[in-house]
Amino acid sequence: MTDKNTLYSGVSRAAWGYFFLYFDINLGTVSILPSFIGMLLFLSSIKLLKDERRDFALLRPLGILLAVWYAGDWLASWLGGSLDGHLVFLDLIISLARMYFHFQLFTDFAALAVKYQSPGDSLDKRLLRWRTLQTVILAAVSLTTCMAQWLSAWWEYVTFAMAIIYLIGGLCLMMALFAFRKVFRES
């Protein structure tokens, strides 16, 4: 059994990891909140929580792959480039890996919530609801990116609408994780 401070820290790191994933602020072509930092925070969270649920440890290799991908993309941005869009098959593999990683991560957090939340709380259901929304949004982004050539007249509107939904969903995900970590502080 993991102590409450470790659980609090693990959930906090994941919540802040989502901050780095959802808030991509650029100076020119370079992100000042790079996504790979978010992945490193997830990996740190996984390390802290792996004794609590075996599935956390199983996410580690995929987290490393995504961290390397995001770091490579961030380094390419310093040269004005990007890793996305050059190999469609590789983009698809990364999209699927990203969806699976986040789906499983939130599934594991919901399972932890069932174990630690107070009777009558519904943190687990809240985490699962936002997990599902995030998965749908990531799938929609992946599909519309593949269909960009056919949506050219509407592309700006489609990406703007998806960005707004994605941002709202991300804020809700982070708020759910920050609410979940309170379980460990109050105990």
Where are the regions that the model predicts?
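Membrane-helix boundary/juxtamembrane motif in polytopic membrane proteins
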Residues: 107-140, 180-187
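C-terminal transmembrane-bundle signature of multipass membrane proteins
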Residues: 43, 136-187
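N-terminal topogenic module of multi-pass integral membrane proteins
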Residues: 1-45
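A generic, lipid-embedded transmembrane alpha helix
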Residues: 55, 62-79
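Juxtamembrane "helix-exit" motif on the non-cytosolic side of transmembrane helices
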Residues: 24-26, 75-84, 143-155
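Non-cytosolic membrane-interface motifs at loop->transmembrane helix junctions
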Residues: 83-94, 154-164
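Membrane-interfacial loop-to-transmembrane alpha-helix junctions, especially the N-terminal start
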Residues: 5-12, 53-64, 127-131
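Membrane-interface helix-boundary motifs at transmembrane edges
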Residues: 47-60, 83-84, 114-125, 185
